[in-house]
C-alpha cells in the first residue's frame, strides 16, 4: 500500500528524512556498486508514483573514516525508514566492517521502533550468496538479485528487475505504515553505532596465496 500523505507528514515530523538507506561494500566490483546505484534510482522512481519527493540515501564517499563521515552516516541511517543491503560475500567480510555495523545499528533501531512486528527494517538483496550466511542475514527473507552477475547491466531493463524493485518498495511501504502505527520517533540524538558488527559469525572463504616464483618455474 502506498504511503498516504498524512503518514508521510507524520513520519517527517517524527524526524525521518529518508525512505531507505542503501548499504553496500565500497569495492572495485561493478556488480556491487552498479547494483547500489541502480537501486537508488529505481526505488526513488517507484516511490515517486505516490510521494512528491522521495529520498534514498547512498553513501558515495571514496574516503572512509573520520568523525564527520561517521556522523553523516549515523544521521542518515537513523533518519531512514528502512535499509536495503546489497549482499555478497564481500559485504560480510571483516574488511568491510562498517557494513556489519550499519546492519547491527538498523536491526537495533527496528527492535526499538517496531515492537511486536514479525518483520524488521532491513531488506537484503543478494547478488551472490555465501554458504553459510551470517545468522543475522539467514533470518531474513532476501530478494534474489543474482542475475545481475550472469545477465549484466541489461538485467536492469528486464521485467524481473522491475518486479523485484516493486517488491522492495512494497516492503518499504509496509515498514513506513508500521512505524506510523507505533508512533515511532527517529530520536537520533541518542543513537550510538554498535561496537560489534552483525557478522561476527561469518566465515570468509579461504583465500589462495598469491603465486610465488616457485609456482611457475620449470
Each language-model region and where it sits:
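Conserved beta-strand-loop-alpha-helix hinge of the TIR/SEFIR fold
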Residues: 26-29, 61-62, 74-132
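Short, well-ordered amphipathic alpha-helices
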Residues: 36-47, 102-111
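Structural recognition of the beta-strand scaffold that forms the well-ordered cores
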Residues: 21, 56, 84-85
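Conserved BB-loop
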Residues: 39-74, 89-98, 148, 155-156
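Amphipathic, non-transmembrane alpha-helical secondary structure
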Residues: 70-74, 78, 166-169, 173
